[in-house]
């Protein structure tokens, strides 16, 4: 179970998804957040504010890559969810690569507002 600031990020993202009509599960053994809506499955990793934001974001990318199946799954998307303070580190992976992987980056501000980032 996520702790500290990561829990804040998970809670805000899950609330945002539910408000948009997603069915959401957390505390899954292989991913922080699993959600479904209209034939789309979303697997998300979340990170909070830490003393090593670059390392933690790199770890999250690695976790997501290891969860991706060998063959593409129709309707599957992936997400990295980070606090605004960590966004710069999350966007170091070029947009083109994230697009190829079907991976979106979301940020959560201190008020819990969620934003999809380009």
Predicted region positions:
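Nucleic-acid nuclease catalytic cores
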Residues: 69-102, 106-110
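Acidic-basic catalytic patches of nuclease active cores, encompassing PD-(D/E)XK
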Residues: 1-30, 36-38
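Active-site-adjacent loop/helix micro-motif of nuclease/hydrolase catalytic cores
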Residues: 50-62, 88-91
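Conserved catalytic cores of phosphodiester-cleaving nucleases, focusing on short active-site segments
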Residues: 33-35, 39-51, 66-67
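Histidine-anchored nucleotide/phosphate-binding helix
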Residues: 61-70
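Long, charge-dense
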Residues: 55, 61, 108-114
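Nuclease-adjacent, charged terminal/linker segments that flank catalytic cores
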Residues: 1, 8, 19-22, 85-90, ...
């Amino acid at each position: 179970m996520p702790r500290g600031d990561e829990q804040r990020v998970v809670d805000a993202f899950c609330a945002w998804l539910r408000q948009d009509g997603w069915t959401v599960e957390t505390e899954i053994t292989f991913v922080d957040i699993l959600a479904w809506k209209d034939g789309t499955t979303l697997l998300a990793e979340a990170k909070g504010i830490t003393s090593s934001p670059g390392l933690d974001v790199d770890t999250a990318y690695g976790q997501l890559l290891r969860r991706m199946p060998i063959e593409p799954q129709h309707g599957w998307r992936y997400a990295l969810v980070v606090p605004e303070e960590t966004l710069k580190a999350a966007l170091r992976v070029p947009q083109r690569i994230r697009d190829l992987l079907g991976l979106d980056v979301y940020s959560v501000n201190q008020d819990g507002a969620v934003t999809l980032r380009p």
